[in-house]
Amino acid sequence: MTTGDCCHLPGSLCDCSSSPAFSKVVEATGLGPPQYVAQVTSRDGRLLSTVIRALDSQSDCPFCRICHEGANGENLLSPCGCTGTLGAVHKSCLEKWLSSSNTSYCELCHTEFAVEKRPRPLTEWLKDPGPRTEKRTLCCDMVCFVFITPLAAISGWLCLRGAQDHLRLHSRLEAVGLIALTIALFTIYVLWTLVSFRYHCQLYSEWRKTNQKVRLKIREADGSEDPHHSLLATGLLKKVAEETPV
């Protein structure tokens, strides 16, 4: 059975009626408990996670609204004003989601998170600059630069040597022609290098703005948790218990 319910996750492409990349599939068989299958995608269509877990109708434990896993190994937080099944989230999952969606607030209740953004290093952009066309352009320009630079240097050196020889033989016309050819060659090479470098600098600047490491400034739940978070966790447990189908 395939349900048409849509998971309103931050930054998701929420079109469950036509998109198979974000759906819930419940298989009721006699071989085992029903399973929950969820695929989470970001704004640019990249698959962030695929989650398969067994459903337990008697369970009243909250789970992360992004990865749909419980508090196994990592505590669940309630960093915003969302309640019910959308109120709990892992800190690492939320950081990954905010980094992928390039936002700093909850897109459901619009609560602004206290985050610290750090730009990613240049090596990550060189490994994965983005779309396939940009990656192909970067590779081609780097290969051309590696091969054209020594060719331009050798060609210019040969032209200048030829111009010197023609000057010794009093062939000024040929010498002027070789010097003009050298100047034109280096002008074209410098212009191509500057245009290519400026183009890739713009791509890197845009990539750096939209691909940052996001760190939440939220203290995870521990023994010294404040009463506000305790009340949120208690209300979340009650809300999930009420919404759990029997």
From Swiss-Prot:
A GO CC term attached to the entry: cytoplasmic vesicle
Chain sites annotated for binding Zn(2+) 1: C64, C67, H90, C93
Statement: the UniProt record of this protein carries the keyword Cell membrane: yes
Pathway info: Protein modification; protein ubiquitination
One annotated GO molecular function: ubiquitin protein ligase activity
E.C. designation(s): 2.3.2.27
Disruption-associated phenotype: Knockout mice are phenotypically normal. Increase in cytokine production following viral and bacterial challenge, including increases in Ifnb1, Il6, Il12, Ccl5, Cxcl10 and Tnf protein abundance. Increase in survival following exposure to a lethal dose of L.monocytogenes and decrease in bacterial load in the spleen and liver. Increase in susceptibility to endotoxin shock.
CDD domains in alphabetical order: RING_CH-C4HC3_MARCH2
Span list, region Required for interaction with IKBKG: 121-246
Domain observations: The RING-CH-type zinc finger domain is required for E3 ligase activity.
Protein name from the UniProt record: E3 ubiquitin-protein ligase MARCHF2
Source organism per UniProt: Mus musculus (Mouse)
Lineage: Eukaryota, Metazoa, Chordata, Craniata, Vertebrata
